[in-house]
């Protein structure tokens, strides 16, 4: 396929063509209070009570809203824990509307990993590491739900275990900017910061070598959205009348999805790379319900 043909195909799919710009815009909107990065102050206005769709630390000085995973842990770990209709409804609503499109287009930490993976150098496939996919579901159940709910202090409150002990985004967006702007915070940094910074450094290195290791193996938010991939309104649709079975789509998929057989696999982040690779234009986005037989979403 010539470069002209590729450009013509991508122009028909603006979401795919402008994905990088959409990710940048989403990150900016999620962290709109840029001056706070230099002041070392966390925005705490009324909007902060609302969750953003992607993984974005509440403690980031620039953060527009709350991280949904952090907010969920705060409710689960509360001494007055009640079923959180708002946050659970938030997950269900976005999951049904978009699925893991949020991971592919709207998540700041996902974009950060994408940028790291663009650094020139040898890259490695994760195709043989597929069992590690299930680790993120274990982390969701254990660190986001069970530990905050059952490991509590004398007041009956649990820590946000995932945020406190695992999440590298908290160090990248929260601890580092706050420490750079506040000498008091710098002097208070201890072993926990060192441990979390080591996790961040590890995922920076892994993201250069592998595509989105945090999204694939660790992220509990991605685990939640993945549960809705097969039922979300936004889907990847394969026209089997056009498909020639070349498997180019599956070979370019960095999330290790067999696009032809399972286009809406839980790991699919709707990035659109399969659409760009398809020589017959057999793959497209579809929004809503479809009874067409050619849309094989099994």
Where are these predicted regions, by residue range?
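Non-ligating segments of multi-cofactor redox enzymes
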Residues: 1-260, 266-298
